[in-house]
């Protein structure tokens, strides 16, 4: 076993190898605090026939890592949760560009989180572990790389902040890089400036270099020879001939504004060229197909670099035409149809109650994690005119949805001010690049349409890069073709005041911060243009919620009244819900949330809650219901759960022989609360609300009257039933 330990970001960080998973091609354990991850990598001995590099990354959080047992009926880990898929994507996107071009042996990277201290996140540790395991194996890999998380707490930059620190941070970025450049960025923020993002990247790169130094020191002791492999190369004569015949024709085919016209023209041209070339080279069909693809790749790139114009005729910094429709779905709480060029998203916002929040088990928290905001992104095959199998939500859909969700998260109102669970669904109806950013724009508009008081509108734009040596071009609002044949996909979302979400993937070994600085500046200009177009359609949240959305109000009740509100076996709260149609939820701190479609039922439910939990006030008049009639009076419910004695002598100024001559069970009576004794028992009076007949002598209040010997007693001697406050609780 080999091991290295250093202090990183104020805590011990350990990398070790040779103790676990020794039959894998390479393995490593990384520990930070008491969080530990195991990475194990394997490789196929033979090249895959697939036209792409078959890399698989699996990231799994073991519940035993936090001393937990999985919830549900089946007590074992199942399919990956969203956050595990997102962590796997971060690792995949960071390491994929660093495998040699042409290497197509299948590689699998497995990450297990085997200890979780609920302070330090494991995803950046997993990136370090994967890098070390690959470098310590026979797999060719142009590393090492490392990843860090950066936050800013009260103006101070923090590397690998704890979960508690992240709760106070206005920025959270995961950054991966090599010694010389950045290879991946992912994160969100609260409207921070481009300058702040760049500063965080510089700080992150310093931490990355430190972690790479640790890896290199340990790799010097354990590195093994790399496996031999041969890059498939076409014969030189075929390569030259394909370039001669294809370059001009493919460039001409590429220059079509419409996506499908372009694709059809390029494919038709390639087919015609291939048929002619096969006459000359009948045994090299595969080489000819690959070389024609290479020509397409180089022609698109050289056109942009040579002419500064793109295949659809736009300039480098030009955004496609935008059209926006809002309120397109009459029953949805908020909706928008956002179209940019040939990319279109139908986005709907739904408002729900706290009961609609998502509750998740997590090894990062002692208890459940609750999500009251969700954005779900769907990318059906018809959006690109394709036919493909549907196998549930893809990793790409989860990743794009998370990016768009994070873009909007920072501008939502506080839950205390707007106590709704919010779900946004973005259905991509057409796609020709940047559908996730269309989802951001459509999501912001749908929330405005729903009347959600966002702090500001949010827009997003996808930036691209074409780089050949020292020449490069940064492209705004990239097409699908530019994404496929370019070197970078850099998505930036935010408001007019700052960035709220960012994601960068590259296909080359890395980018220096100078290019990223230019890309951020150009992205800001594009974002402001898009925000201007959105303002023309809907500049602010609508003043009222949809008539189909629930109205929610919160009231605070004393904690000791929670039991009375709920009632025996939930009787009281169910009664309110059944009578009003409202939905009630009660928190442990006495916060009661009332939700109803329609203001009348909500107000009625609110009054009933306040009636149950309010304290009767001596001297106030109440409308009550006679619950019981006895020989000495009646018991009247003046508030739900609060019954008080209406003594026979308090029914009329004149003498009443039989209480049932005045009131009957079920009667609604108006009474005045005249007394509450030291034991909390309540006494009512009807006659106090009636004019006193002339000449009638004053009587002492009942509390001062002597006990009678005819069996008639004051209500307080009935064991407390007549005067108790909160009788509903005593009955349970």
Swiss-Prot record:
Q: Name the keywords, alphabetized.
A: Cytoplasm, Magnesium, Metal-binding, Nucleotidyltransferase, RNA-binding, Transferase
- State a GO cellular component annotated for this protein: cytosol
Q: Where is the S1 motif domain?
A: 619-687
Q: Where is the composition biased (Basic and acidic residues)?
A: 702-720
- Compartments, as annotated in UniProt: Cytoplasm
Keyword RNA-binding listed: yes
Cofactor(s) the record lists: Mg(2+)
Note whether Phosphoprotein occurs among the keywords.
Answer: no
State where Mg(2+) binds.
Answer: 483, 489
Q: What is its EC number?
A: 2.7.7.8
Q: Which reaction does it catalyse?
A: RNA(n+1) + phosphate = RNA(n) + a ribonucleoside 5'-diphosphate
Positions of the UniProt region annotated as Disordered: 684-732
Q: Which residues cross the membrane?
A: none
A Gene Ontology molecular function term of the record:
RNA binding
- InterPro entries reported in the protein's UniProt record: ExoRNase_PH_dom1, ExoRNase_PH_dom2, ExoRNase_PH_dom2_sf, KH_dom, KH_dom_type_1, KH_dom_type_1_sf, NA-bd_OB-fold, PNPase
**Recorded family membership:** Belongs to the polyribonucleotide nucleotidyltransferase family.
* Functional summary from the UniProt entry: Involved in mRNA degradation. Catalyzes the phosphorolysis of single-stranded polyribonucleotides processively in the 3'- to 5'-direction.
PANTHER family per the UniProt record, alphabetical: POLYRIBONUCLEOTIDE NUCLEOTIDYLTRANSFERASE, POLYRIBONUCLEOTIDE NUCLEOTIDYLTRANSFERASE 1, MITOCHONDRIAL
- By what name is this protein known? Polyribonucleotide nucleotidyltransferase
